[in-house]
Structure formats: C-alpha cells, structure tokens
Amino acid sequence: MKIRIKIFAARILILALRVGAQSNAYIFNDVDEVINKAIEDKSFPGAVVLVWKDGKTVYEKAFGNFTYDRSSPKVKTTTIYDLASVTKVVATTTAAMICYDRNLFSLDYKVVKYIPEFGVNGKENITIKNLLIHNSGLPAWKKFYERDLNYDDVINEIYSSELEYKTGEKTVYSDLGIITVGKIIEKVTGRSLDKFCEDEIFIPLKMNSTFYNPNDSVKQFCAPTEIDNYWRMKTLQGEVHDETSAMLNGVAGHAGLFSTASDISKLMAMLMNKGELDQKQFIKQSTIELFTKKVSTNSTRAIGWDTKSDSGSSSGTYFSKDSFGHTGYTGTSIWADPVRNLFVVFLTNRLYPTRENIKIQKVRPQLHDAVIKCLERINAK
C-alpha cells in the first residue's frame, strides 16, 4: 500500500511539473511569438532570451539556428555570443565600479593623472567621468582597420586624438573614450583588462563561459557574426567582430567580450541584489546606484550604463524611467528595471550575414513589451 501511495504521489508530482511547464510556456507565448516572427522575417537567424524577476530566472529559451541554413547548429541556451558594446558594461563599467569601490581612482580624477600622453589637443582636463558618460568630446570611433597600424599605433592615435567638440558640451557615444577607461583600469590595477575582469568579476561570479578571445575548442559553440567581405575576408565565428578591438588583440574596453545569457544573468542578479553575492558585498549598493542613474537631463547616459529615453527606447514602453541597460552592435542587449525587480538579457547574431540588416531595432522594444505583458498576466492569476 505504501509503495502504491508513493507511486501515485510521484505521478501527481510529474503531472504537476508538466502542467507547470505548459502553463509557463503559455504565459510566455507572447515572447515566443515575437522572436519566432523575427526569425521568420530574417531579423536574425537565432537568439537566446532570459528573463529574471524577483530573484530568479522565470524564462530562458533558445531560438533558431546559427545561420539561416536550417542544417546549421541549433542555438542553445548555452550558445556563446560576441557581446560587442555590451562589453562596455559587463566588463569595463563593472571593473570601474570595483576600482571606484577600492578607492583606486575617483571619477573626477583627470585622465592625464594616469595617462600623461593623453593631455594634448585640449584634453588636459577630461576626467574619467567624462569618458564614462560620453561627453568628453572625443570622436565616436575611427576606421583604424583601413590603415596598416599595430596595437601601439592605435592606442597612441587615440591618446593624441583631437576633440570634435568642447568637453561637457554634448553627449556623443564614443568607443575611444571607453577604450581609454580600459587602459586606466590596467594602470591602477597593474593587470591587463581581461585578467582583471577574469579575476575580479568572471571567476567570483562563476561566469564560466565569459571571456575575451575564445580558444579554438570553444569557437564552435559561438554564434557566427558577419561574413566579412571587406577586411578579414572570412566568416567571423569566435573572433571579435569589432575591427578596433581586433586590432587591439581582441581585448579592449569597448568590445571583445564573449558570453552567454546565463552568465550575464549572474552579474545582473548581483547588481539587482544591491551588490550582494553569497552574503558578501561584491560591489557597494551606493556605487551601483551612482553608476546606474542618469547623470543629466540633457542625456540618457548614466556612468557607463545607458538609461531609458522618453521615446524610442529599445527597452520598449513599459520599463520604468529608472531602468538601465546597454545594447551591442552584434545584436545583443541587457535591460534592467529596479522598480519591477526585473531584467532581460537578449542575445542575437543579427549581423549574419551582413551588418546592413537593422531589423532588430524594431524587435527589441517589441520583445521587452511582450515580457512585461506576460509578467502582468502571471500577476493577474
């Protein structure tokens, strides 16, 4: 009799789990529809979406294939993506938070304190904060790859750059500024940027699939980005897409990091948990609040992070005004809403086969709106 009861109980448990899974799939059907339609419309060949709410992952799903060829590998939740500019927040801004916490620099310190050669062509008074909020006056980027330059040539040209506008006058998103922040982090820590991030962020957070320069054994698990027909003349897979980062040996403050949705969620969960990790303070709550809040009414920029714009935000309509996030050129994004205790990680390889495809610009807000609607449906039950 006891055995029968146990068998019956086990069957009930299995049934409950199945119902729960079906219910959850139904609840997030709106999200599935957005992504499946985007793949059908060839906005990108594949994607991973992860939704975290109130302390746990409530949705994580892979869609599509590595390419539009259905015989190519299917995307898995463990698929590794070239993060492009999401590197700026997952690596460089997080590293800057840690340096700030440890009093290795002040945001108001001038760049020339650490890089004297930077102080030419009117850049003597630019601060670390100016670089992180993108109002330094530096150019957005340069086509270094069109010339025969080595690592030192690129760095020296960044340091000697002329300003395109007066520092503090306006906000212009600049790769050059964040590359410079990465070099400052190397100066104050005595470690390369990739080594510091590995030691102080990725290993402690158990982000085991997050790294610069994936080795040969890992590349097959990376979603391909672009078929490069103008510089490297090959399909890029497990090799950084960003040309400037490639010229800097794949390690730079603005781009170069590879990761998974699950790994990114570990970092974001720590930030949403007020900086706590395993009952220890990984980053001070006050530091997180400082870096993720909009700095000025004249811009959406926070310190390293971006915030939601009044209209046309990639976070959609329903994320709160306190939301912070970042996008990446390859088709990646993170958006977090502290008011809702929610974040969404959205990884795609929209560049495949060409960067001319910008359909993701419409998909991003649709996805985030669908997430909010699905969560509201859960709350209504």
Stretches found by the model and what they are:
Residues M1-Y26:
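Bacterial Sec-dependent N-terminal signal peptides
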Residues S323, T330-F343:
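Short, surface-exposed beta-strand/loop micro-motifs that present aromatic residues
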Residues N121-S323:
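Short, surface-exposed loop or secondary-structure junction motifs
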Residues N24-Y81, L104-S106, D153-N156, S161, ...:
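Short, conserved catalytic-motif segment at the N-terminal edge
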Residues Y352-V363:
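A short acidic/glycine-rich loop-to-helix N-cap element
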